[in-house]
Amino acid sequence: MKAVSISVFMLTCCYTAIAQDAINILVDSSSSKSVTLTVLPDTVTTNEANAKELEEWNKAMRAYYYHRKEQFEMLPASNKDIIFLGNSITDQCEWHELFNNMNVKNRGIGGDDTDGILERLGDITKSKPSKIFIMIGTNDLAYSKTISHIVENYRKIIQSTRDSSPETKIYIQSILPTNDEIHTLRKNSDIILVNQQLEQISKEYSLTYIDLFSLFKTDNNKLNPEYSLDGLHLNGKGYMVWKNAILKYVDE
């Protein structure tokens, strides 16, 4: 069968016009069908893209963040809500359809990090949601924030949620592995260290910690290509794995 070549701009966060190296990925192991992805690596610097392009990229990221944040503020909310809170990996899923539950709400924003979560957390907890499933931190690493910064912000997120909505159940989901040969600032060794800290924090606060990393990793701790085309975000099969791993917590 003839290979199919498709050019796709993959964004670490939301939208950008800066594209870098192309990689060829086998889509169907039973055929020669493949796609060529134009990937935006984490190593974009002013040596690779001019300052104006990077400035426009950052402006687009911030605009997307505030557009989503303001949209969420306009939507109805109740104490029955089950919130999925995170970055683009959360943002890209249709959660209420996945669980066939209209109480499940997507509050992911592409490009978000732990600082962004803290900035908008009050808008989420003021309605006293039933549950919050959190996955955040991979972008912190891409933005060169330290592990201690990520961990400290998690503590603030947990404490702030408890202070404003003490009945809300908080579920800490591990950061997913990546293909760190492409996404070079998101080293899986660092992700593992963060996840170890998140598991410890969950014990300290008597929260449920959900180890998704182990479900998505290969033997060498990279994101299994069965679940992703770009080495960072998930495909449909990946979201089904995620759903099955947490279904009992959503339903409890």
Task: Tell me what each language-model feature is.
Residues 157-161:
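Hydrophobic positions in alpha-helices of CheY-like receiver
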Residues 165-169:
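A short helix->loop->beta-strand "cap" motif at the edges of active sites that frequently abuts
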Residues 21, 177-252:
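Catalytic His-Asp segment of secreted/periplasmic serine-dependent ester chemistry enzymes
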Residues 147-156, 187-195:
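Charged helix-capping and loop-helix junction motifs
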Residues 83-85, 91-103, 114-152, 175-179:
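Oxyanion-hole/transition-state-stabilizing segment in secreted/luminal serine hydrolases
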